[in-house]
Amino acid sequence: MGLKALAGAEVAGKLATALPGAVTESGAASITVDSKALASVMRVLKESPEFEFNYLNSVTAADYIEYFEVVYHLTSMKKKQTLTVKVKVSGRENPRVPSVTHLWQGADYQEREVYDLMGIHFDGHPNLKRIALWEGFKGHPLRRDFL
Amino acid sequence: MPAYDQLILPYSSADADIEEGKLIEDLIARSRSPIPDPDAWLSGGPRAGIVLTTVDQALGWARSRSLWPMLFGLACCAFEMMAAAGNRWDISRFGMEIFRPSPRQADMMIVAGTLTWKMAPAVRRLYDQMAEPKWVLAMGACAISGGTFSESYAVVPGVNRVIPVDVYVPGCPPRPEGLYYGLMELHQKIQKADSLKGKLHLPRLD
């Protein structure tokens, strides 16, 4: 009954026909997606009968100085499969990625947390504001250049 | 199922958030240095010349044996405080088994755990709402100095930045025995204290 982690290359192959050029890299259990194609990739991953990722475990982000990486962990309850989706976002001033709250409501607070601590904007989020820190706090504390 | 953006979600208004942020920034700006500990009682020494029980002694005895603590668990120290209140350590031996959920019915505040700046205005407001005489016990490393989080952007480096502290109980977290030692020290302090002197007036927080 364990969950099976899908291989990145396998998912990339399945996505290549519907969305050519969307997946830029594929790892052992992850795919890296172009930020412009994220919304459509996520819709396919949730809705197509091949994947049916109906549960979003978490949204998080990492700061690699040259770029930010937003990481989504997906699980399909029906197919007992998991996948990690990553998006690279460049630019420290105004990094932006599309929100996935319209697909998974659970992304709401987690995207707010990423926005609060990393300063990544989620386009289309219904209520993007700080969640843990207070209004007026200067900076985004989980960034590598904070302090 | 209605579309996501049609759902009515319990979002607070932006104005309330900005107001809260201003309050916190204001409190941080005003809390650069610790509030001095109430220690006027230390210079007094034992009262001499009167053999009969003074009013102060009677009051001190009554107060120290009927402390009602405020229900205030912030982090993992709260579990040790709950254990202290439970039947194994049994805080009712000290006449203080009634943890009050209202500051207006409490005599002392056990600040059990890490205090963040976002929580700090609430702590200060609850302290202000407690009736005199009132005492504060800082429980654990975080409440004393911020502990391992003392350099954090989000943690108050010691609750004595926000409210005056009478007794510090070190430990991470302190065991119930440690908390009891602190409480017994507080009992002695209350008995020595002059009931009419040594009140500290803090500026109002609005």
Residue ranges with predicted function:
Chain A
Residues 1-147:
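Terminal low-complexity/charged segments
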